[in-house]
Structures are given as structure tokens and as C-alpha cells.
């Protein structure tokens, strides 16, 4: 199972643009892509909370609505899959594949469809699918159950500690990618760390043989 943002697709610019649209009327500091990258990972609700001060927390609902209004209309204006993602998915033909995102399910599906990636997956779930989001084990176990697998034969691939923690709690192997939104140092808890998604194909074969 794959994380979405920062693992399959670089969505940082479009998320940054949506955040800046949301906060513009309130005179808040304009965010750079680098600012946004530090905030991404726990879903839209937490994303908005992180940019609000305690005094401004009453604006959360309004900012979320403005964010979603803009983001849903500009979903793939700048977003694109990372290098070799399609090639890797095409080469993983013998395994069931799923997407496990902290982005809302409808947005996750639209993003993957518009980028021509949805056809590679047996299941796509978002933050609102299983009742909980990463780093909870619940969405991981939900996917395992839906696909008729066991934790022992499952792998989660992601770019953040949320992915690693969710995988560990669910008892699945964890693979961290270093090309996403987090540093290699922050990913050291993963069972495996890869710099290029193409490394996943031989790694999956190796894990399946053990």
C-alpha cells in the first residue's frame, strides 16, 4: 500500500496555493512551498490548525472551506507523479496495490484518476474512509481486510513518520522513500529506506521470498 502525497505524487505547490488562497483575506503570512512541506501529512484539518494561532482558531472552519473550494478546482495544476512511479506500478503486476492517504477519499481518487494512476490500484482510501487516519493502524488494517491479505504479507510505502508508525502498529513491513517531503534522518525507523521508487520492485520480491 502506498501513501499518496510525497510518495506517488508531488502535490506541494497546489496545496500551498490553496492554503494561500484560504488565508489571504485574513492578513496572515504567505506560505512558501517549503513552509507547506513541513505541515503536510496529517490531512487538511490538521494542516489548517497548524497555520492558525490560538487566537485565530475560530477561523478554522472558514479556512477549510476556502481551502477545499480552491483546491478542488486546481487539484492538478502543478501536481505530477514522481519519476518512475508509473513504470514501477506497471512492474508490480503480481501484487495487490492500494493507496492509503490522509487526504479525503474523493480528492485522492480524483487526483489519481486525472494523473492516469488510478487504474494501477485495487483500492484507494482517504482520511474519511476507515474512521481513522494515519498514524493509526486502522486504515492499514482496513486495506488488509478489504484485499483479503494478512499483515505478514503486506507492506506500506511512504515518505513520513506517520506512514511508518501506522505500519508498525498494524504489523506490516515499512518502506520509506527519501525523495518526498521528509529527511532521511526522520525516516530511520522504517524497515527499509529507498532513494528511488524503482528499488521497490526487487525489494518486494525479496520480502515476499522471506
Where are these regions (language model features)?
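An amphipathic alpha-helix signature
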Residues: 16, 20, 33, 37, ...
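Asp-based, Mg2+/Mn2+-dependent phosphohydrolase catalytic module
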Residues: 34, 109-210
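Short, acidic loop-to-helix structural element flanking the phosphoryl-transfer center
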Residues: 73-99, 105-109, 137
Amino acid at each position: 500500500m502506498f501513501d499518496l502525497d510525497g510518495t506517488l505524487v508531488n502535490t506541494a505547490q497546489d496545496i500551498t496555493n490553496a492554503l494561500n488562497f484560504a488565508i489571504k483575506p485574513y492578513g496572515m503570512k504567505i506560505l512558501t512551498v517549503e513552509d507547506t512541506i513541513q505541515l503536510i501529512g496529517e490531512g487538511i484539518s490538521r494542516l489548517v490548525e497548524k497555520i492558525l494561532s490560538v487566537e485565530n482558531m475560530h477561523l478554522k472552519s472558514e479556512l477549510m472551506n476556502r481551502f477545499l473550494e480552491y483546491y478542488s478546482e486546481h487539484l492538478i495544476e502543478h501536481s505530477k507523479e514522481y519519476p518512475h512511479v508509473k513504470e514501477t506500478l506497471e512492474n508490480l503486476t503480481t501484487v495487490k496495490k492500494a493507496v492509503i492517504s490522509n487526504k479525503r477519499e474523493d480528492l485522492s481518487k480524483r487526483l489519481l484518476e486525472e494523473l492516469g494512476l488510478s487504474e494501477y490500484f485495487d483500492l484507494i482510501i482517504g482520511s474519511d474512509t476507515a474512521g481513522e487516519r494515519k498514524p493509526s493502524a486502522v486504515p492499514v488494517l482496513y486495506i488488509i481486510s478489504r484485499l483479503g491479505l494478512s499483515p505478514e504479507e503486506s507492506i506500506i510505502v511512504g515518505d513520513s513518520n506517520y506512514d511508518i508508525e501506522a505500519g508498525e502498529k498494524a504489523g506490516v513491513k515499512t518502506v520509506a522513500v527519501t525523495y518526498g517531503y521528509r529527511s532521511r534522518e526522520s525516516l530511520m525507523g522504517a524497515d527499509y529506506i529507498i532513494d528511488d521508487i524503482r528499488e521497490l520492485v526487487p525489494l518486494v520480491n525479496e520480502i515476499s521470498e522471506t
